[in-house]
Regions:
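Basic/hydrophobic alpha-helical interface regions
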Residues: 1-69, 73, 77-114
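Negatively charged
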Residues: 107-213
């Protein structure tokens, strides 16, 4: 379905106002967001970045209030700034995506005086932000959290899931079983907000990476 010019203008205004709010309240994130381009993608279901552009599904954008939109904008730009888009290519992707989100969400939480409302979506609840050892994700790199997640598979992951999902409803329902090595984290992984599939298409040698060094 083709979007009307008025709708596109409405979305453009919302994203611009979000950048302005973030620039006033969290200058670090606001300045980073000024380097990005923005777009719409009706097929992506939520939101994603390829390191150059942050693209929203219009339906997902319509569901977000201003506070939620600001959180999502900060979430996406921090993935880029921390080079999550360029790293972890050789790692198990589902597990790495979870690790990256834990680190990003925890850093956003820290930037907002540990107010969990700032990393909460009405549809999903409180975003995951604790490492498997119960400490905040901002204390670690994504790779360090990834290694913890690997060790927790089949050991303490039930407790880990419970801790991180205490205030989360999850976005995608269902109880499908999987043979993946991450099947024990399938419920927990549903709390991933954005789409990380574009990361696989980014080559390490690109000049794009140099922008964020």
């Amino acid at each position: 379905m083709e979007l009307s010019n008025n709708k596109i203008k409405e979305y453009t205004k919302r994203l611009m106002l979000s950048k302005m709010r973030i620039l006033c309240n969290n200058g670090f994130y606001g300045l980073l967001l000024m380097h990005m381009k923005y777009g719409l993608d009706e097929e992506c279901e939520t939101v994603y970045t390829d390191g150059k552009v942050i693209r929203f599904d219009p339906k997902f954008l319509d569901e977000l209030n201003d506070d939620e939109l600001d959180f999502i904008m900060m979430h996406e730009i921090l993935h880029v700034a921390l080079q999550h888009c360029f790293r972890g290519i050789e790692l198990e992707q589902e597990l790495y995506n979870i690790a990256c989100d834990i680190v990003v969400n925890s850093n956003i939480l820290l930037s907002n005086n540990m107010d969990t409302r700032t990393i909460t979506l009405r549809s999903d609840g409180e975003a995951m932000h604790l490492a498997p050892n119960g400490k905040e994700g901002y204390e670690y790199t994504a790779e360090e959290v990834y290694n913890m997640l690997q060790k927790n598979l089949g050991v303490n992951n039930a407790k880990f899931q419970s801790t991180n999902r205490s205030n989360s409803k999850g976005k995608k329902g269902g109880d499908e079983k999987s043979n993946k090595p991450t099947e024990h984290l399938s419920e927990f992984g549903r709390n991933i907000i954005d789409n990380h599939t574009k990361w696989k298409q980014i080559e390490k040698g690109e000049k794009l990476q140099e922008l964020w060094l």
